Amino acid sequence: MSEQSREQRRYEPVHAVSRQGGQPDGRGWVEEVPEEETRSYYGRSVLKEPTWTWEIPCYFFAGGLAGASSGLALTARLAGNDKLARRALLAALGGAVVSPALLISDLGRPDRFYNMLRVFKPTSPMSVGTWILSSFGAVTGVAVVHDLFGVFPRLGRLSEAISAVLGPPLATYTAVLIADTSVPIWHEARRELPLVFAASSAASAGAAAAILTPVVDAGPARRLAIGGALLELGAAELMKRRLGKFLAEPYESGKPKRYERLARALSGLGAAVTAFAARKSRAAAVAGGALILAGAASERWSIFEAGFPSSTDPKYTVMPQRERLNARDGGARRG
């Protein structure tokens, strides 16, 4: 074979690329590679499916209710509404007792929960959250003992104030926790999830207090329940819009869709009942509060369930990365 023939064969792929629409970049011809279909790696997902079980969304709900209830308790106390303050404080303690039990059940052994307390890591949402939960439970317990039995007056009042300070972080840190994972539908909603969780927590705290408190004293609780429920609905819709149609797809089918629809219906109906009937009827207050509580729980379950299809289908991981790379490359060319 002649030298010229070898050179022709050597550069034939380059000529073929140029004939197919390749572009020169100063060093030769660069092939325009067609977009590849998103695939898994040898049949495996890019990400691992979350290993959390049913205890975790229940913990999201219980912890949020506890955290928001402590703030409601202190607000009612400062306003002189001791009946509402006591019942909100009891709701906070109930959530603080149930939450560690749910976490321990998910972890499998009590010593795993204890081991998370041995080292404090400010950069770990789980470590910070465990310490917040433990501290919250301790001070809320002291505050309840003081409120019920009148002992330790100074310590009791201080504990109630500290409980109210720790309440908002307890109600929202779980949103930071799941947003800190690599699950696309959680991570990409990291700006909106804390608002959704805060609103849901406020709604559930107000609803629980409205159920437990006599109608005449429950006005602030009803207003918190209604406002929280409406804000929750709005924040959840905002979260989906900012995710975009593609990333929010898991909310449009299966369990996430069913729970989300249920959350909308229950929260909306509960807010209406609480607003228009609960001011005069104890039965209506209980019914409206129960509907709002169920709606808040359903919202947490919807978010939890959406994480599974979002993590197992590789397109939700690969496509956003590809879009970011394309945007970066486009910016570099313009610069």
Predicted regions span which residues?
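Short amphipathic, positively biased membrane-proximal segments
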Residues: M1-G335
